[in-house]
């Protein structure tokens, strides 16, 4: 029910896309029965971590932990040949691991899924061109932005040295 309430609130605040603010979520008590993840590399938490603002990141996690019975630090890993992306990802993962362990929070390994199978990448790029009126698709830093099976995700967890990430 709480997830439906959040979805309804997000559509009531529709501006180009459905949206709901963190303040609304925390004030509404809608997170209490949900598993809350901290989000992808572009999330509020991870922007703070990329800027080395661990103090504000801890404050944010404390607020989320008070609103939810189950909070986990979400981690994502994507292979890339781009050195700048790899440095950013490595630094972010380091911050995420440190923060999760220091606050006693579990890690949740997810994959940034933009399409269902690896073979769908071209179709997804065509969709982005059509939907957003671009001449070219969006360049993704890294690879593997599709729905991976549990064996592939366990492999990523092992590679990252985090076999207990769920």
Which residues are covered by each model-predicted region?
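Phosphodiester-processing cores and adjacent nucleic acid-binding clamps
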Residues: 1-166
């Amino acid at each position: 029910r709480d997830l439906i309430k959040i979805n309804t609130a997000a559509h009531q605040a529709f501006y180009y896309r459905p949206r709901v603010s963190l303040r609304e979520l925390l004030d509404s008590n809608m997170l209490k029965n949900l598993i809350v993840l901290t989000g992808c590399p572009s999330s509020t938490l991870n922007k703070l971590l990329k800027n080395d603002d661990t103090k504000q990141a801890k404050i944010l996690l404390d607020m989320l932990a008070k609103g939810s019975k189950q909070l986990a630090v979400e981690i994502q890993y994507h292979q890339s040949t781009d050195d700048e992306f790899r440095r950013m990802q490595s630094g972010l993962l380091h911050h995420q691991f440190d923060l999760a362990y220091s606050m006693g929070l579990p890690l949740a390994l997810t994959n940034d899924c933009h399409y269902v199978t690896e073979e769908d990448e071209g179709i997804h790029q065509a969709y982005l061109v059509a939907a957003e009126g671009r001449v070219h698709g969006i360049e993704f830093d890294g690879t593997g932005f599709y729905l991976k099976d549990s064996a592939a995700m366990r492999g990523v967890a092992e590679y990252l040295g985090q076999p207990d990430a769920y």
